[in-house]
Amino acid sequence: SFDELCNTVFQFQYQYNPVYHKWVDLIDSLPSERKIPQKIPALPISFFKEQQVKTGNWQEQKIFESSGTTGMVTSRHYVANLAIYEQSFLEGFERQYGSIQNWCVLALLPTYLERENSSLVYMANKMIAMSGHSESGFYLYNYAELANKIAALESRGQPTLLLGVTFALLDFAAQFPMQLTYTVVMETGGMKGRGRELTRPELHETLIERLSLPSIHAEYGMTELLSQAYSKSGGRYYCPPWMKVFVRKEDDPLAILTEGT
C-alpha cells in the first residue's frame, strides 16, 4: 500500500541520507518507529541551499538548481539517475493528458531557458523530443513567431500544449489575443520581480479572456521535488499516485496544518 511504501522509503532515507538522518534525530524521538505518511518528518527546502542532500554515496548525473536573482543562494538537487526523473514526469503527465505523442509541445520559458540546470527546462526539452512533433520547440520573446505557429496548428486541429511561465504568458496574450480551440495553455508560475504579482484567479481570468479559453491549466513542480501536480481548472491539483501533499506548520515540522489549506 501507499502507507507501507512511504514507511519503507522513510526508513531507507533515514538510514542512508546523513542530512535527513541528523534532522530526524533532532526533531523525532522515535525515528525507528513505523510511520504513517502524516507522521514522517519533512525535510526543509532550506537544507537544499545549505547542504549536499544525497542518499548513499554516488556521483551525480545532474545537478538541478532553483531560480533566483543574482547573488541569491539557490537550491541544488543532486540527481543520481535522470531516467527516473524522466519516467516520473512522463507518466505523471500522461496520466492526466494522454500520450505525449498526441501533442505538439510549445515551451515559452524565458529566464528559465536562459540559465543552466533548470529542472523545468529539462522536462520541457524531453517532452518536446518525446512528442515527436516536428513543430514542437522552445520560444523566448519571439511572440509573433509563436502566435503564427499556434494559429497554423489551430487551423489543422492539432492538439497543442503551450507550457509557459506566468509573466511570459501574460505578455504574449496581451500582444496577441487569440481564440483558441485545440490549445491547452498551462502556466508554471513565475512572476517574481515582474511587477505586481497577480493572484492565481486574477491570472487565469486574464488569460481566459484574452485567449478565449474555458480554463487555464497549471503545472506545479519544484527543484527539490522531482514530481509534478497538474490542475485543469480552478486551481485544484491532481498528483500522481506516488505523491501526496501535506501542509506542515512552520513552527512545528511534525504537525499538519488543517486551517487555511
Protein language model features and the residues they cover:
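Short, conserved loop/turn and helix-capping segments at secondary-structure boundaries
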Residues: 79-83, 201
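Active-site glycine/GP-rich loop and adjacent strand/helix microenvironment
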Residues: 3-12, 16-18, 102, 111, ...
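Short, conserved acidic/polar surface loops in the N-terminal third of protein domains
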Residues: 74-78, 108, 116-119, 173-175
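Internal, well-ordered alpha/beta segment that forms a basic, Gly-enriched binding/recognition surface
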Residues: 70, 85, 89-128
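Short acidic, glycine-rich loop/turn motifs
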Residues: 28, 68-70, 247-249
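Gly/Ser/Thr-rich beta-alpha loop segments that engage phosphate groups in nucleotides
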Residues: 70-73, 223
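Active-site diphosphate/adenylate-binding microenvironment
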Residues: 15-65, 73-78, 86-101
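Residue-level signal for well-ordered alpha-helical scaffold segments within enzymatic catalytic domains
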Residues: 8, 22, 26, 91-95, ...
